[in-house]
UniProtKB/Swiss-Prot annotation:
This is Collagenase 3. A motif (Cysteine switch) lies at residues 94-101. Zn(2+) 2 binds at C96, H222, H226, H232, M240. Disulfide bonds join C284-C471. Residues 176-246 are annotated as: Interaction with TIMP2. It is an enzyme of class 3 (hydrolase). Zn(2+) 1 binds at H172, D174, H187, H200. The gene is MMP13. Detected in fetal cartilage and calvaria, in chondrocytes of hypertrophic cartilage in vertebrae and in the dorsal end of ribs undergoing ossification, as well as in osteoblasts and periosteal cells below the inner periosteal region of ossified ribs. Detected in chondrocytes from in joint cartilage that have been treated with TNF and IL1B, but not in untreated chondrocytes. Detected in T lymphocytes. Detected in breast carcinoma tissue.
């Protein structure tokens, strides 16, 4: 992420803007006129917004196609310049109101604050939470940034503070109205006078301190990053990524991308209480190992840490997402996964539990214990799993052993477990991830993958693990 000069976001008056055609991809009948209008408003709002006179800066992209390509590039989507379902899905996710691309001058602003001791004031409160819960969320959000910089934040109870925090709905006094429930959640202004540093939260949202509604701490920590001078990040694992994702109840750790950004502005603090900040995996890292792989409705999902790559057929560039951005109720990290295509289900394993999912939805009654599959109670986790649709059998790997589960009769096959080395000689005594395709099983062990022929029962090729990601 490159910290830069932010300007206050502009929510435009569309009736004064000259409409430009928005190209769509595939079957245009799949996209409604409402979707096309929504996409155009989105692009005008977040990619080279106009100034108050409705005039684009001369060096800004002026066509909808160019803006759409920028948006697809920003979010790591296939860059086609055409509106498709995947692009529209990203556009419809709840997000911050600050633009992703576009530099424009409305209010005077600076790159960063010229002082390290900043003040903030909570002007009003949301009715969704107690005053104490709101104050705790904001204090915790500021601490995210003060932990890694020399910045100090002091709360004022009256008067004018550097960062004025308020809740409002629709038009709330800054000419940049909110849009009702979901969609645009909040916005903040960059360092500077007047509105500089101020953060506004849409009170049409349901604010909480949990996974329900929108977590106020997470949104506030993001907005305060803008208040301090940070732009949006293209890194889907960064706090400053524009799309909201609930990241779990465990102790929050500021991702490395955000640490690098804020420290480039203010320098490091004296002592970082959490020196190990999570990094986003690099798909072309030669030492990359993978956690799990599964197909899902014709696509391939490749899991690593709290992320997964989504690989479409006939597409080279894999799209990277946080796992919780698709399945908020799943753990951040998973151990294994497999698809049961005829039932339109995927099964996800983490520790002693497993989940059954239909698309985005977790089936009722899950998670269940892996011991319910017939595994002995001493098995603490499944490290890899692969399903064979023609036989209805699923291989489950744990440690140096493999079990075979009968998905049709819901029992574990006899004569199992077996040693991995005996059934699949040459691949090693453990499996990190596995999938099957066209009569071959692909075993992943550390940074290496083995292409194993089912017919000849032998290894036919050894490749880097990340070759599945076209590296």
């Amino acid at each position: 992420m490159h910290p830069g000069v932010l300007a206050a976001f502009l929510f435009l008056s569309w009736t004064h803007c000259r409409a430009l055609p928005l190209p769509s991809g595939g079957d245009e009948d799949d996209l409604s006129e409402e979707d096309l209008q929504f996409a155009e408003r989105y692009l005008r709002s977040y990619y080279h917004p106009t100034n108050l006179a409705g005039i684009l800066k001369e060096n800004a992209a002026s066509s909808m196609t160019e803006r759409l390509r920028e948006m697809q590039s920003f979010f790591g989507l296939e860059v086609t310049g055409k509106l498709d379902d995947n692009t529209l899905d990203v556009m419809k996710k709840p997000r911050c109101g600050v633009p992703d691309v576009g530099e424009y001058n409305v209010f005077p602003r600076t790159l960063k604050w010229s002082k390290m001791n900043l003040t903030y004031r909570i002007v009003n409160y949301t009715p969704d939470m107690t005053h104490s819960e709101v104050e705790k969320a904001f204090k915790k959000a500021f601490k995210v940034w003060s932990d890694v910089t020399p910045l100090n934040f002091t709360r004022l109870h009256d008067g004018i503070a550097d960062i004025m925090i308020s809740f409002g709905i629709k038009e709330h006094g800054d000419f940049y109205p909110f849009d009702g429930p979901s969609g645009l959640l909040a916005h903040a202004f960059p360092p500077g006078p007047n509105y500089g540093g101020d953060a506004h939260f849409d009170d049409d949202e349901t604010w909480t301190s949990s996974s329900k509604g929108y977590n106020l701490f997470l949104v506030a920590a993001h907005e305060f990053g803008h208040s301090l001078g940070l732009d949006h990040s293209k890194d889907p694992g960064a706090l400053m990524f524009p799309i909201y994702t609930y990241t779990g109840k465990s102790h929050f750790m500021l991702p490395d991308d955000d640490v690098q950004g804020i420290q480039s502005l203010y320098g490091p603090g004296d002592e970082d209480p959490n020196p190990k900040h999570p990094k986003t995996p690099d798909k072309c890292d030669p030492s990359l190992s993978l956690d799990a792989i599964t197909s899902l409705r014709g696509e391939t999902m490749i899991f690593k840490d709290r992320f997964f790559w989504r690989l479409h057929p006939q597409q080279v560039d894999a799209e990277l997402f946080l796992t919780k951005s698709f399945w908020p109720e799943l753990p951040n990290r998973i151990d294994a996964a497999y698809e049961h295509p005829s039932h339109d289900l995927i099964f996800i394993f983490r520790g002693r539990k497993f989940w059954a999912l239909n698309g985005y939805d977790i089936l009722e009654g899950y998670p269940k214990k892996i011991s319910e599959l017939g595994l002995p109670k001493e098995v603490k986790k499944i490290s890899a799993a692969v399903h064979f649709e023609d036989t209805g059998k699923t291989l489950l790997f744990s440690g140096n052993q493999v079990w075979r589960y009968d998905d049709t009769n819901h029992i574990m096959d006899k004569d199992y477990p077996r040693l991995i080395e005996e059934d699949f000689p040459g691949i090693g005594d453990k499996v990190d991830a596995v999938y099957e395709k066209n009569g071959y099983i692909y075993f992943f062990n550390g940074p290496i993958q083995f292409e194993y022929s089912i017919w000849s029962n032998r290894i036919v090729r050894v490749m880097p693990a990340n070759s599945i990601l076209w590296c």
